[in-house]
């Protein structure tokens, strides 16, 4: 069984699903997305973005952007290094929520922690992208948009494999760091990068 609209229906009102992508990579921002779906226009096939092919994610993201209230929030590498990844993720989620056209009455947050300072009540939903279509939609748009950014950065900084690893720690990424060094898009607070900088 995939995600459904049950949690949203029980809560009533305007419910935003919120998810993030990019907590673990060595490079690039963390990206959050908030989505308020129209219950009459829920795209078919919504699921955890990790369970979908890239082509399917891209197609669904286009549909979601057409029929839903969607807002993205980003926290930069500098903010990640200054705040830590947990707090930077919360910041990105708040930015995503604040960017919605109509303020929601409730937020469903994927995971087990609610960002402080949200503009409405919120509920954590563990593995929410597999349970709530709103969170699934947010996970899809967040991943598609962050992946697109990492592919753009890969053109500017070839040799790290960002076009395929999206900034995560892979053998190619490690080899790129060894041969080419650290870029402005690397998270200096993350151990593999800090170790190189300490030399």
UniProtKB/Swiss-Prot annotation:
Q: What is its EC number?
A: 3.1.26.4
* Lineage per the UniProt record: Bacteria, Pseudomonadati, Pseudomonadota, Alphaproteobacteria, Rhodobacterales
Coiled-coil stretches noted in the UniProt entry, renumbered to this chain: none
Q: Which residues are listed for a divalent metal cation binding in this entry? A: 19-20, 110
Concerning NCBIfam families, the annotation shows: PRK00015.1-3
What is this protein called in UniProt? Ribonuclease HII
PROSITE patterns documented for this protein:
RNASE_H_2
Q: Which domain of life is it from?
A: Bacteria
